[in-house]
Amino acid sequence: MAGGRGASGRGRAEPQESYSQRQDHELQALEAIYGSDFQDLRPDARGRVREPPEINLVLYPQGLAGEEVYVQVELQVKCPPTYPDVVPEIELKNAKGLSNESVNLLKSHLEELAKKQCGEVMIFELAHHVQSFLSEHNKPPPKSFHEEMLERQAQEKQQRLLEARRKEEQEQREILHEIQRRKEEIKEEKKRKEMAKQERLEITSLTNQDYASKRDPAGHRAAAILHGGSPDFVGNGKARTYSSGRSRRERQYSVCSGEPSPGSCDILHFSVGSPDQLMVHKGRCVGSDEQLGKVVYNALETATGSFVLLHEWVLQWQKMGPCLTSQEKEKIDKCKRQIQGAETEFSSLVKLSHPNIVRYFAMNSREEEDSIVIDILAEHVSGISLATHLSHSGPVPAHQLRKYTAQLLAGLDYLHSNSVVHKVLSASSVLVDAEGTVKITDYSISKRLADICKEDVFEQARVRFSDSALPYKTGKKGDVWRLGLLLLSLSQGQECGEYPVTIPSDLPADFQDFLKKCVCLDDKERWSPQQLLKHSFINPQPKLPLVEQSPEDSGGQDYIETVIPSNQLPSAAFFSETQKQFSRYFIEFEELQLLGKGAFGAVIKVQNKLDGCCYAVKRIPINPASRHFRRIKGEVTLLSRLHHENIVRYYNAWIERHERPAVPGTPPPDCTPQAQDSPATCGKTSGDTEELGSVEAAAPPPILSSSVEWSTSAERSTSTRFPVTGQDSSSDEEDEDERDGVFSQSFLPASDSDSDIIFDNEDENSKSQNQDEDCNQKDGSHEIEPSVTAEAVHYLYIQMEYCEKSTLRDTIDQGLFRDTSRLWRLFREILDGLAYIHEKGMIHRDLKPVNIFLDSDDHVKIGDFGLATDHLAFTAEGKQDDQAGDGVIKSDPSGHLTGMVGTALYVSPEVQGSTKSAYNQKVDLFSLGIIFFEMSYHPMVTASERIFVLNQLRDPTSPKFPDDFDDGEHTKQKSVISWLLNHDPAKRPTAMELLKSELLPPPQMEESELHEVLHHTLANIDGKAYRTMMSQIFCQHISPAIDYTYDSDILKGNFLIRTAKIQQLVCETIVRVFKRHGAVQLCTPLLLPRNRQIYEHNEAALFMDHSGMLVMLPFDLRVPFARYVARNNILNLKRYCIERVFRPRKLDRFHPKELLECAFDIVTSTTNSSLPTAETIYTIYEIIQEFPALQERNYSIYLNHTMLLKAILLHCGIPEDKLSQVYVILYDAVTEKLTRREVEAKFCNLSLSSNSLCRLYKFIEQKGDLQDLTPTINSLIKQKTGVAQLVKYSLKDLEDVVGLLKKLGVKLQVSINLGLVYKVQQHTGIIFQFLAFSKRRQRVVPEILAAGGRYDLLIPKFRGPQTVGPVPTAVGVSIAIDKIFAAVLNMEEPVTVSSCDLLVVSVGQMSMSRAINLTQKLWTAGITAEIMYDWSQSQEELQEYCRHHEITYVALVSDKEGSHVKVKSFEKERQTEKRVLESDLVDHVMQKLRTKVGDERNFRDASDNLAVQTLKGSFSNASGLFEIHGTTVVPNVIVLAPEKLSASTRRRHEIQVQTRLQTTLANLHQKSSEIEILAVDLPKETILQFLSLEWDADEQAFNTTVKQLLSRLPKQRYLKLVCDEIYNIKVEKKVSVLFLYSYRDDYYRILF
């Protein structure tokens, strides 16, 4: 029993131990998992008495913590002793964020789970289930409406960020994919190359055979370099050629029978008359002159790439036998001597230059087998000769003849004043260029060469008979005789060959008297050109005030009335056949049809007799004394600049004057009062109808209290005048070079110079009113004085493009509204034309259907710009001021509003009203809205209906459309019309905005088909069509002419080794400065993909690779470097680079312009320091100090800040979203791409007010010291917070930089220029320029040496897709190194630059081996040395070679010298020679070089010290030179004369010496005792001989050189005194610097 009980007890104890172990293990695991959230609730958990587990777990949602947890609960589990076989007790306490229902639900779930897990440990499973439940119910508590709003906004922001991140990731993936694809392509390309290489090795012979058989021989023929007549484009791209098929220049001469083949091209060299040898490509023959025996060719001068004319004479002989006899040789030698005499004469002719003579450039003669060819290069004149005019055009009008005569006399007088006689003045030797300028050619030399070459050299002397009936008169009076005959021929339209000369009596009296003074038989009575210039024919006394001639009037003729039939033109004037001959209108044109006539004038359809094309000629009666005439001239000037396919072209304009008998009671033509005009004559120009005129007359007049004319600009009155012409052509080229430079000047506003316009308070109708008054006055005069008197009438003729079809008014009346596609196409073309004229800063202001024409191809042509102008805005205040003197404003019966611009039904409200509001180009858009409605609406039958409908449309509140227009078919039309007719101009669109609007349907298929195909092809770069297009593009043939001219301006053939040496010296000097700052040279890749964000103005030179990808050459060195820094994650670097940058050419098929730019950049990870900027500026200051030529120019430093510029723009009312556009406009203004008026027009298109523009100019024109500008800058701080913060930040940066520059010792003037705009889109922070003012072509112009700034924000734009990390600070400067080259080259004292230190010369061929070994030793020792390749050169040739290459030392190696070498020195213009052992040569040369370098360093240090002492940074005078401050240098002057001098003479010589050497002494002065001057009475050549004296050695060597000197020169006694004095100064006194000065020749040399 006992044993049984014991057994039974052990059996019960085993499960008990198993429970406790399992419980302990679970508790340990839970504690490890939950850590601090686990709590054992047993009071004595580790006591001896074992209790069942009772724990508490604090549970949260699974995987969450912190702010994301909104719910939690505590799980209490109390286990029985037999757990886990028995379910434990479960409780949930301290629940947060859970409702009671949720807690009960969770508890029920736990109880069910516990039952299922019975028999297994389950607390962890229960806890995990609780956490899962909490995760599902983890929701934030309800929030307030404000919190929900903020949360929603945060979510939206987060969504946007996610979307942006997604797009960025997509772009990154695309970039990475493209990178990977290109890597694969590179691998495939390598494989293909290997395979292709193997194939080429196998089939090389077959390939060569195929290539030879398929090669096109025609492709190797050289094309003609110079072609004949080129097409002249007229109108809408239509080409017309001259009737003769030749260029205007070719028609100067008769056809050349012996014209060479088009492929011939000879190269000629000219030396006579030119300082440098000229190389010329001889082109095709353009004519010959039998009288002068010459042939004329076109030619191209290679150095400048300019066209010239080549006049060629051939002196021919025929040999009687195989060899020349002595007599024949003597005759040939005689001819050669005559040609040499002609060359001597020609040397003086090339110096002649006058606007009315053709310049000679060079002459050359060359001997061939049986002839001598003489060539003369002359100026190329684009025009015709008067002989051609005589043969084709007949008589020259009197007015034009007067102009020709005055210019001929001016040129002839210039020749005579220079003792040059023309000898053969005739119609063929007078040219007239395109501007009407007369130029005399073939003077003097042509007659002489013609006489030499006229007959065979060996022909026997015989009597010659002249074919001319006129005697030949010689001398200057003979030129006047021939001038009279020429003028008589021009007036008659044919050559005058009778003798004695008879002057027709029907010529004007003053012209008859003028001709008598020219062709009188007695030479003594014949007037000179100077006397003839004062004749009354040249200087007439006009009855009416004459109009000032301008370029527009250069083709002006005497007036002659048109010959329109009387039934078409009732007011046609009377004319005679003689008067008709003087009219350019009748000479050049044939009348076809009267197109229209009205108050403003008549429009006539004519045909040009020369080209056969039809034109429309507008004939306008004018009064030359009126202000309105000046206005018309200005308008014609403006209109001539327009060239667009949708604008009527204006070709020529001229004035004709005619005196006719005035019939009493008859008004002048086109001056009939409007009330008397019949409907047929008082209409308008082409296409108008009587019905339209009546409609306009019935239109209600607008409310108007003053003349509706406008002022020239927002801040100028209406009388502001703009100069007519800008600079001359050379200045334009010079300005273009400046614009194409490394950078442009700062914003320096200047007066515009585009036109000479005074826009007065007159318009078309007020002008008619004035004409009516003139007519009334004339009528009154006739009543008082009924006799017939001569009356002068002036007409302006304007030659315009002729539109054959109709006007838009005709098209509207024919039912345009039915053809919707045509309607939209025409509307788009009108918008294109308006956008063009608005871009040019002009306003039409009279836009209506009758002023919009349609050509034969049904394309729009906007015309009738009679009231167009190009001013910025108009204010009514100016109108009222100007109205005061012009009388009362009325409506005239023609339907127009007098004083009103445009027609009442189309004029915009701001023009029509009387308020003081400004208007701009949008007035045309309002008129277009009315026009577009008429295009879209059915033709209105009656005038009253049209007036009513259009007035309803002009309602100020909103347009009121007719009921039958308000349907679904016109939805887009209504939207466009409502937008255009908005009475608020700010809300009205511009033409460009409307073109880009979605309201306009896409272009029609016939217009856009090609563009669509191209767009589709370019969009699919992997398609077959794209590859085919690229293949065709790269298969283009390049002609030899294009190949030659492509880089002709770069390869000019004028290479100079000295220029290259100077460039190398400058570069080495600049690099030395950079290296002192720790910079390293770093060059970036040449090509970049096209980047529109960086280069927005298409200023980069773009190219296309074989795949069609657009790449660009570097515009500057900054952008490629920023890209390089970004891609390589560079944080700290100082680099310099001297590389080429490129500018695109305006002309096609030209090599991009190359400029050499030097860049210096500092990249640092320090972001809050201004020291890098100051160091960059200081570096440029150091470079200036290295070059004396730059120190003399007095450079100033201009600073600005991009934030300060932004603050100014914001302060001036410019919206922040338009800042980028304003930067572009200001930058274009700085680079002079836009005139000031164009800038104003572009600002106006941005809807900026005139007040904003005035404030802007007020700020950007400010510059000065920081202290002086601080009040102006501080005035911005008082503005809104954003502007104030920008100003404070920028002001602090400017103060820091200015302070650092002072600490660094920068002595240049530092100024703040608020108008400095230098690549603002690229820079962020300080920007700066180094600028000086220099005098160029009689005007002071700014010259920029360097410019730069901070560009931190440019680097992130080039970062890769996966690049992270800080962005460094970067500051850089660009230096126009070409300007430094030019400054050093143009120094008064030329800089000595040598290509090597020593030249090794072998004396004889046997010594060449020794010379080679010696040169190798010099190279090894680090001495730059050259070896003379030609050992046979003479001593003179050797010296010339050393002089040309500026080599100082020469080593002569000869076997006769044994182991010695002769070393010749050419230092300081003296020659010395010394024998040195060959083994000691290296040491000897190095010692010489060290001495030379030390002397140069001492001289440079002395100059630098002087410059630092005297440099004050002040602008001393207009030339930009520094004033020399400090102590005046007064050295010891010794005057040594051959005879005794008086005290006054000696004093005069001393003053002369000190004045002459003042500047040089100031630069060399260190101590007064170390500089002395010896003034002697010797010539310049003798002074140079003293440089051979050797005073550095002992006395014996000095005496030896003195004996050598005296043996070569006379006056030995005086020379011995000079040598003794030199010995006393240099040897005994040991004076370091001695000036040997010749007061006879004012010449000196320095003896160091």
Curated annotation (Swiss-Prot):
Keywords: Acetylation, Activation of host autophagy by virus, Activator, Adaptive immunity, Antiviral defense, ATP-binding, Cell cycle, Coiled coil, Cytoplasm, Differentiation, Growth arrest, Host-virus interaction, Immunity, Kinase, Neurogenesis, Nucleotide-binding, Phosphoprotein, Repeat, RNA-binding, Serine/threonine-protein kinase, Stress response, Transferase, Translation regulation, tRNA-binding. Residues 1021-1492 are annotated as: Histidyl-tRNA synthetase-like. The keyword Cytoplasm applies. One of its GO terms (cellular component) is cytosolic ribosome. It comes from Mus musculus (Mouse). Residues 146-205 form a coiled coil. The lineage of its organism: Eukaryota, Metazoa, Chordata, Craniata, Vertebrata. It catalyses: L-seryl-[protein] + ATP = O-phospho-L-seryl-[protein] + ADP + H(+); L-threonyl-[protein] + ATP = O-phospho-L-threonyl-[protein] + ADP + H(+). This is eIF-2-alpha kinase GCN2. The gene is Eif2ak4. Residues 775-784 have a biased composition (Basic and acidic residues).
